[in-house]
Amino acid sequence: MMRAVADRTSTGLRWVAGVSVALALASCVFAATGTPRAGTPGAGPKGTLVIHGTGDVSLDPTQIPAFRTQGYGWAWSGMGGLFLRDDLTVVNLECPATDVVAPVPKAFPFRCDPGALPAARRAGVDVVSQANNHAYDDGPAGLLDSLNRIRDAGLVAVGAGSDQPEALRAASFRIDGWTVAVLGIDEALDPVDEVAGPDKPGTAAGHDFALALQGVRDAAASSDLVVVMIHWGVELDARPRQYQIAQAHRMIDAGADVIFGSHPHRLQPVETYRGRPIFYSLGNLVWPRLTPATWTSAVAEVIVEPDGTIRARSLAVEIVSDGHPVLVATP
């Protein structure tokens, strides 16, 4: 097993999909096996990939005061080193990691401590998505500083940028013979002007779903595997809305292979469509312990075999105290 190495090269391999649709509750461990796509593997040998995806992560010490006494390793110490044993770990960072203090008017602004990022990297986190409705909480200056701080910590940021092309551009990783693309899409805008523009910093795509689909297609054109991190839906909803299901299917039809959803702050069902897993909402990971519906969580685990077969399951997690998630059972 190899840890992710960023690279912009590509085999150019594309797959065609079989058909499989199933729903499972994400609060339970489940297994969903997709049919391998024709034509895999591509040029050169490929290994088995293990990818983990999570829901919302806050590294804001005003939201989680325990960080001031326990340190930022507290956020990850209950995961049993899970993210160090995989090939790629992606999380939704629900705040700008910045010292810029320029809060935009909103009910619940968040600001993460940039000093928390090295602990996330040491825990095995590789990619953080800023495609969410809090990345812009300190305006364009805070967002751009956050992206720089993330990179300085050895992490890769997706889902936001200095303009829309940068915000929607996928990060590319060369891992064990595979070219893996990861992109972030923000559908949960508050307000809408947080979205990036032609010459304006912000988050990716917004409510322009045609633009989001084009981002998926662009990533698929130069990658073997496409992972989409999307912030969408309605907070505290127990199930995805019909429009989300339709959008998820369209993203897979456009070339997405794995979809990790966030924003509702609680787990939602998992679907397998055309052999590709859709985690509609992974709930909270590093977050205050608020209600049973929001402190019961999961980490998505996706395994891609050398022949292209995709298996997926949810690993149960409980937020046992503010900012401290713990794996319920070690896999």
Role assignments for model-derived ranges:
Residues 3, 29-331:
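Acidic, metal/ion-coordinating pockets
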Residues 6-8, 12-34:
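Secretory targeting and sorting signals
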